[in-house]
Amino acid sequence: KTDTLLPFDIGETDDMYLLNFLPMIRKIIDELRAGRSKAEIAYAFHMTLPVAFLSMADAIRKRTGLNRVVLSGGCFQNRILTEATIAELDKAGFEVFFHEVLPTNDGCIALGQAVCAGAQVKL
């Protein structure tokens, strides 16, 4: 539900997009001070991140035409976050890649970076 989403911004600088979660953090603090349940805030947080990731992917797709998204890293050990992110990206027509053999963690990111670097270097 969109009424459960927390605020975030996407900024652009030097041909890079940046997700700014400062508005989200401020809202979470306000909600905690107002006595909102931690479970509701956690739910809103987990539902907002996939929408933020989709917004970022959409901005990049509009600029580049790229339609593939690769998900990796420690945050995707969280099944709720992973499933919601894949669902949002799928719904928007992205081709989503998620590893099945390697463990979900930063080591997978390092391997991906090495593969990309290797593809650019002619040995």
How should these model regions be labeled?
Residues 114-123:
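Acidic, glycine/GT-rich loop-and beta-edge segments that sit at the periphery of enzyme/chaperone cores
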Residues 11-13, 107, 114:
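Short capping/connector residues at structural and topological boundaries
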Residues 45, 49, 57, 70-75, ...:
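Active-site proximal loops enriched in glycine and acidic residues that flank catalytic Cys/His/Asp
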Residues 68-69, 79, 85-109:
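Conserved phosphate-binding/catalytic loops in two-lobed NTP-binding clefts
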